[in-house]
Amino acid sequence: MDRMALVVGVNYYSDKRIQNLSGCVNDAEEVARLLKHNGDSSRSRNFDCKELYATGPDHAVNRAAIKDEARRLFQSKAEIALFYFSGHGYIESTGGFINGSDSTRGDEGLSLRELVDLANGSSARHRIVILDSCYSGAAGSVAGMENHAAIAEGVTILTASRSDQPSLERKGHGVFTSLLINALEGAAANLTGSITPGSVYAHIDQSLGMWDQRPVFKTNTDSFVSLREVDPAISLDDLRKLKKLFPTEDYEYRLDPSYEPRDEGRTDAMPPAEPRNNRVFSLLQKYNRHCLLVPVGADHMWNAAMESKSCRLTLLGNHYRRLADQGLL
């Protein structure tokens, strides 16, 4: 398998001065469950996940274990190497840290600088680091990294909060990972069913208020990468029909009452419903529901048909039309 993920959740900390957490392991387990298989009807395999969970004294995850497994991950020949951590984080003037069960001080954790160095030096084409910990936004920042480049080509970092913010738990679950899980389940999917790091960030960012913790997204990649696939909202065959129905970007598709299958509102002067046009209209309505087209001179598609108006593509619709025209769907 060319996709590998290291998923770490730390609830338990051996030092009594460090508060144990309640939702990190559950969050990490759910992230791993979603990464292992795609969410489309085929349920095809996705990431090969290594899981480290600290739940108590007999099941601790120490800093050395996190570092060793992170090194193994980023030294692999995987196409995509993904690191996820949920647990305590710490920041000081020299940078940030993520803390294993054996941490007695915040700066005894795995440094974010060291983690980013491992990702930067990896031969994997795509290296993705996702951190749900306090002050995780320090990862990839130039400050405190001296002459190190923040992130190398092919590296993407998504963190729960900025370098000066704590990460929040509500009802035993991290706010960030709850939204991450929602995104991976399909809320961040595009129309073709792909869930990307960028779409995950956009979903999380748009779901939080200005007074909440703010996620951080940093990437240095020029190629498309999908974290997970779900069933597309519109079939690829239907999306490919855009270029036939709309020969040009500014083309307006003319409608008339024969496109509407129902007789409600139809007068004797109007043409009857025509099955072929009804099938086309059903597809146009599907495009409209997914913001690919809008009626022209009418509030709704029904009005556009019954009043012999037209419909045209939106900017998003033209984007998918171009993809279809270029053979990219």
What kind of region is each of these model predictions?
Residues 5, 189-273, 307-319, 323-326:
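Caspase-like cysteine protease fold
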Residues 273-295, 308:
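Short amphipathic alpha-helical interaction segments
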Residues 14-33:
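Glycine- and acidic-residue-enriched helix-capping/strand-helix junction motifs
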Residues 11-13, 86-90, 136:
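Short glycine-rich anion-binding loops that position phosphate/pyrophosphate groups of nucleotides
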Residues 22-26, 42, 54, 58-61, ...:
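A short, glycine/acidic-enriched catalytic loop
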Residues 297-306:
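Short, Lys/Arg-rich nucleic-acid/phosphate-binding segment
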Residues 28, 32-79:
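Functional beta-strand-loop-alpha-helix junction segments that form "active/interaction loops"
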Residues 9, 35, 127-218:
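Active-site-proximal C-terminal subdomain of hydrolase catalytic domains
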